[in-house]
């Protein structure tokens, strides 16, 4: 399976947990299987965005901040990640 296809499957599965009211399970799935290599492809950015969104949904502000910070450092214009990072409560 191609890496981008595997990433999309992870995103769909993790997002399904969020849709079922279990965003922390989606975050756990992504953290267990997703990697953040030195050479990034678009699917790595999508994985980080999904992790940040699900962490925020789960009330894990620190986890959301970490995922969105990593993403914004790689690509400040990726979707609305910069805005989402700014809107997260401090601490």
Where are these regions (language model features)?
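Short coil/turn linkers that connect adjacent helices within long alpha-helical scaffolds
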Residues: 37-41, 72, 76-79
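Register position in tetratricopeptide repeats
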Residues: 19, 57, 87-91
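Short, charge-rich amphipathic alpha-helical segments embedded
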Residues: 1-10, 74-90
């Amino acid at each position: 399976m191609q890496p981008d296809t595997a990433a999309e499957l992870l995103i769909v599965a993790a997002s399904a947990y969020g849709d079922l009211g279990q965003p922390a399970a989606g975050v756990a799935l992504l953290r267990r299987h997703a990697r953040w290599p030195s050479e990034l492809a678009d699917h790595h950015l999508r994985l980080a965005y999904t992790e940040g969104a699900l962490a925020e949904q789960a009330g894990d502000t620190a986890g959301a901040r970490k995922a969105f910070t990593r993403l914004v450092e790689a690509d400040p214009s990726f979707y609305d990640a910069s805005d989402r990072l700014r809107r997260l409560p401090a601490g």
